[in-house]
Amino acid sequence: MSSRTHANGKINPMEIVDAGRFLPAADGTARYVEQLRVPALSAGTYSIPAGAADNQEPHAEDEIYVVVSGRASFTAGGRTIDAVPGTTLFVPAAEDHRFHDVTEDLTLLVFFAPAYSGDPD
């Protein structure tokens, strides 16, 4: 049983998450770190260093990105926009999408619904 679940099997009403891991991988590549997972959703942090590639594939889940810091372009559904702090992006399940032209280290909050079914690490 995880710390997110009471002995009665119900999910705790509140979870405090140490989300201080906004660092890219040691080799300078993009890094996703899952911070929270319950059946209905998962949340994590995604860091892409300036100049690095975003090599993710489409997911089976709906996804929301919130840009915390940095600057990049984002393409999905045939549209490209500037991704800057405060930008919130919704990507439907199975939609091809990508961050590119990362000119400043990019840090994002990421939410999947239902919970991400891929390998979170």
Where are these regions (language model features)?
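A short, N-terminal "cap"/entry segment at the start of jelly-roll beta-barrel domains
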Residues: 1-45, 55, 120-121
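Short, charged/polar surface micro-motifs in flexible loops or helix N-caps
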Residues: 39-41, 49-53, 71, 114-117
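Short, conserved beta-strand element in jelly-roll/cupin
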Residues: 47-48, 58-74
